[in-house]
Regions:
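Extreme N-terminal, non-catalytic leader segments
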Residues: 1-8, 31
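NTP-dependent small-molecule kinase module
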Residues: 2, 140-141, 158-206
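P-loop (Walker A) phosphate-binding loop of NTP-binding proteins
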Residues: 12-14
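Conserved lysine of the Walker
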Residues: 19
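Post-Walker A alpha-helix
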Residues: 22-23
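Post-Walker A helix-loop "phosphate-sensing" segment adjacent to the P-loop in P-loop NTPases
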Residues: 27-36
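ATP-dependent small-molecule kinase phosphotransfer cores
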Residues: 38-99, 105-109
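Conserved phosphate-donor/acceptor-positioning beta-strand/loop module used by diverse small-molecule
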Residues: 99-104, 113-138, 168-169
């Protein structure tokens, strides 16, 4: 049965800001929340599992999904394709479950256009220095790739004000608390319209 109270939450962030960790922690706290698993053409990392972290597909398979209109949103990030399956999201919402998407700002813009009632949340690092530290501590990318990720991250962060809420991920537990409050409808202190939030974010941006 369709439940009009079911909401769609969109979480976006620059690479290294910690959105994956935050969303996974939130889903543990709120098992009724449905996490939409994205399609990607990216190569699977050693710590990732098919159907758990991503749905890994070929470039041709992704092109077919996109051409058929099976994707609610799609974006090209670091030479790889990412997208959210439309049917999966629609079914969860129809079943009355809140759904959370973990995507980038490009995809978030598409979802806001397709689903104007969605709640959008942008995750920021506490500083650009901390962002660089997090990217380097992964030990998965070359210096050239890290420099590119940092450059793209700064560009991504310029879109923060397009979102309904902003969370500074300087303390994991507090950031998860903020994310949970937003899902519960009590996240006013994180609203991007709030002057204190805007001042804090502007101090982070270069």
């Amino acid at each position: 049965m369709n439940d009009s109270s079911a909401r769609l939450f969109v979480v976006a962030a620059p690479s290294g800001a910690g959105k994956t960790t935050l969303v996974k922690a939130l889903v543990v706290r709120r098992p009724g929340l449905r996490f939409s698993i994205s399609y990607t053409t990216r190569k699977k990392r050693s710590n990732e599992a098919e159907g758990v972290d991503y749905l890994f597909v070929s470039v041709d398979e992704f092109a077919r999904l996109r051409a058929r209109g099976d994707l609610l949103e799609s974006a090209d990030v670091f030479d790889n394709h990412y997208g959210t399956g439309r049917k999966q999201v629609e079914q969860h919402l129809q079943d009355g479950h809140h759904v959370i998407l973990e995507i980038d700002w490009q995809g978030a813009a598409q979802v806001r256009e397709a689903k104007p009632a969605c709640i959008s949340i942008f995750i920021l690092p506490p500083s650009t220095d901390e962002l660089e530290h997090r990217l380097r501590s992964r030990h998965t990318d070359s210096d050239d790739v890290i420099r590119r990720r940092l450059r793209d991250a700064l560009s991504d962060m310029s879109h923060w004000s397009e979102f309904d809420f902003a969370i500074i991920n300087d303390d994991l537990e507090r950031a998860v608390d903020d994310l949970e409050a937003i899902v519960a409808g009590a996240g006013e202190s994180c609203a991007t319209s709030d002057a204190a939030v805007r001042d804090t974010v502007l101090r982070i941006l270069p």
